[in-house]
Amino acid sequence: MDARGGGGRPGESPGATPAPGPPPPPPPAPPQQQPPPPPPPAPPPGPGPAPPQHPPRAEALPPEAADEGGPRGRLRSRDSSCGRPGTPGAASTAKGSPNGECGRGEPQCSPAGPEGPARGPKVSFSCRGAASGPAPGPGPAEEAGSEEAGPAGEPRGSQASFMQRQFGALLQPGVNKFSLRMFGSQKAVEREQERVKSAGAWIIHPYSDFRFYWDFTMLLFMVGNLIIIPVGITFFKDETTAPWIVFNVVSDTFFLMDLVLNFRTGIVIEDNTEIILDPEKIKKKYLRTWFVVDFVSSIPVDYIFLIVEKGIDSEVYKTARALRIVRFTKILSLLRLLRLSRLIRYIHQWEEIFHMTYDLASAVMRICNLISMMLLLCHWDGCLQFLVPMLQDFPRNCWVSINGMVNHSWSELYSFALFKAMSHMLCIGYGRQAPESMTDIWLTMLSMIVGATCYAMFIGHATALIQSLDSSRRQYQEKYKQVEQYMSFHKLPADFRQKIHDYYEHRYQGKMFDEDSILGELNGPLREEIVNFNCRKLVASMPLFANADPNFVTAMLTKLKFEVFQPGDYIIREGTIGKKMYFIQHGVVSVLTKGNKEMKLSDGSYFGEICLLTRGRRTASVRADTYCRLYSLSVDNFNEVLEEYPMMRRAFETVAIDRLDRIGKKNSILLHKVQHDLNSGVFNNQENAIIQEIVKYDREMVQQAELGQRVGLFPPPPPPPQVTSAIATLQQAAAMSFCPQVARPLVGPLALGSPRLVRRPPPGPAPAAASPGPPPPASPPGAPASPRAPRTSPYGGLPAAPLAGPALPARRLSRASRPLSASQPSLPHGAPGPAASTRPASSSTPRLGPTPAARAAAPSPDRRDSASPGAAGGLDPQDSARSRLSSNL
């Protein structure tokens, strides 16, 4: 008997599939894993020896193994041997054959069998006979069905459809600007979406898109009912027409649907701090609050009235016309105006999307809400003015009968009634005539009370709105009232009062802000951006700041304080201790000295910076010529920032020494600090290069100021005396001791014009000043003063050379950003000495100014003694310079 039609192979165990216990040892590789030769047609397998029951010894192949090389054999090997026991595809293939066979006519494996209890009931199978007839092989549909079932055995169609997923997303809050602002982050929005999913079926989030569109639709129906229903009740007798019935049916249906949806919509508690999504809590909360009002306003009174109307004859209907008052239950829909708050929240969402300001949005919404409420009350009052006489069958002393308007059209009646109501509410009259009946008198008083209340609310809201739109001006006015009371209390003269008034006008310009509080509430990056935008250009005009670290400049900007000075005010006075430096944002100041010499400084200039380091006394006075808006920087804040940037402190000190040297003064404190840093080896190559560039650009700035304005605070200095080579060598040695990297002499037109500096004569022929002949012609004003001038591209037309470090952007050193410093009017202005125009061509870069040792060794107008014999007699120049510097300190 063929094994395919029999009940099973002799000796084969019914449970051929391993149980989910410890897996048996892997059997030897089956022959189908080796590439078999093309087999001949397989003969029908006859009964053979039974395969062993022990899994490790299951090496004998069944008769159908001869077909493994064919197409169905390859397909079966891909499907894990057609569900043979012990293969992964057994479960899926066992149910893939419609005739009870495993894909190609083999007996299917069914549960139960002797080996089942030993290996587990879920995976033990027994072979049962197949139905008669040929069995088709496994087709693509069977394989697709097997794969669709999945490893977890999920049935087809278990996932939600696309439409269901889309509708479910409408019930959840979307990821948009409004949701992100309400919940804080996208992660919080996703958590809220998970809350909606876990809350139950058909739970609507109050911030979902579905609820938004539904509320907007209900708002339209609500406005329509609040306007149309009073008109229909009052001015129309026949309410059984088709349009009226359709409107009532549609509106009542939507109100009932809204009543049901409110039981499934989350409730926002305590200013959006908590959202209730539990169905039980939603139901209890809604029943305790707005359910009664919504239910009463949603009762289909129209249907009940139409049903009752058909059973009443005409006579009874005339007497029952007063039942129309029942339609006033729709007026309870007025309480639905409280849902306008939800509309306002979504209007805010639209405003944020279109980048509208909050003040404009709140102003528009408050005005629109107030005007809409007043118009709605006027509409209701007009309907009430005609409804009461109508219910009384138009007595002779009512305003309708007096004017003979009983049979007029409803539009004329409504117009006169609305005019009468608005006259009462605005308290401007009684309409066409004064009330005569007692009913009209009471209606008039009621209208006046409602109108006065609305008028007061409108005035209050409008006043608060105007104040909120310009709170800074209101704050300024309140502050100035206090100032006026102060001046009156102290009986100040009229000129003082006018001066104080002008100061407040220019200082605050009609608006007062608490700038410190506003900036203090912002985060650090935003505050720095605002400060940089307001005044960084002013500070960047300084060479020290232009070549400084941007972080240092930002730290300095946060310490600035805004001040305003009037014409004639002395900002600083000569002889006082300097505690501030100033940056001019707008205005003109004059720098005055004892010699009555003036120098004008305007927008972008600065003065008083040397005193930040020395805390010395002012050498000049600064007076405001116009209204000046300045930024001040105190010495304490300046030093606080310099503690974090020691290199910038050394740069400030070096520039201060150079400036003092140019005006013929010195400061022992700064000299001691620089000498200490020099001896301790604090200066490195990069810092020294940065400081050299700062000093160079500071000198070039003074040079450009001298070219543009020859008038200074002092007369032109005398020409520098002739010097010997020994003194020049000492000067170079002193410069090398201050900065070891500098091995070339200091040259420059400014240094030649200084009475304290000496110059080594250029090699070659003697300068023209020493010859008895006429002096050489001066350079034209537009020509560069020296070969170094063409390289100073920030002031010329050539490109600037790259600076020594990454913190030295040459583009910041433009001529426009180099205003004159107020500490430099003390510099000797005037035409440079004769040697300035005959300066030799040299490629050396100007370095720091001469050290105090060089100044001590060099002859000057202040010191007429000769050079030190030690310096001229061949002593070490560096030792001589350092010894003299120590003696000066």
Swiss-Prot record:
Keywords: Ammonia transport, cAMP, cAMP-binding, Cell membrane, Disease variant, Epilepsy, Glycoprotein, Ion channel, Ion transport, Ligand-gated ion channel, Lipoprotein, Membrane, Methylation, Nucleotide-binding, Palmitate, Phosphoprotein, Potassium, Potassium channel, Potassium transport, Sodium, Sodium channel, Sodium transport, Transmembrane, Transmembrane helix, Transport, Voltage-gated channel. It is found in: Cell membrane. Residues 1-159, 754-889 are annotated as: Disordered. GO terms for molecular function: cAMP binding; identical protein binding; intracellularly cAMP-activated cation channel activity; molecular adaptor activity; PDZ domain binding; protein-containing complex binding; voltage-gated potassium channel activity; voltage-gated sodium channel activity. One of its GO terms (cellular component) is plasma membrane. Changing S126L: In FEB2; affects channel activity resulting in faster kinetics and increased current density at higher temperature compared to wild type. The keyword Transport applies. Residues 129-155, 785-860 have a biased composition (Low complexity). Highly expressed throughout the brain. Detected at low levels in heart. It comes from the Eukaryota. Residues 1-215, 262-288, 339-369, 462-889 are cytoplasmic. InterPro entries: cNMP-bd_CS, cNMP-bd_dom, cNMP-bd_dom_sf, Ion_trans_dom, Ion_trans_N, K/Na_HCN_channel, K_chnl_volt-dep_EAG/ELK/ERG, RmlC-like_jellyroll. It catalyses: Na(+)(in) = Na(+)(out); K(+)(in) = K(+)(out); NH4(+)(in) = NH4(+)(out). The keyword Lipid metabolism does not apply. Phosphorylation at Ser-668 by PRKG2 shifts the voltage-dependence to more negative voltages, hence counteracting the stimulatory effect of cGMP on gating. S-palmitoylated. Residues 17-55, 760-784 have a biased composition (Pro residues). Homotetramer. The channel is composed of a homo- or heterotetrameric complex of pore-forming subunits. Heterotetramer with HCN1. Forms an obligate 4:4 complex with accessory subunit PEX5L. Interacts with KCNE2. Belongs to the potassium channel HCN family. PANTHER family: I[[H]] CHANNEL, ISOFORM E, POTASSIUM_SODIUM HYPERPOLARIZATION-ACTIVATED CYCLIC NUCLEOTIDE-GATED CHANNEL 2. This is Potassium/sodium hyperpolarization-activated cyclic nucleotide-gated channel 2. It comes from Homo sapiens.
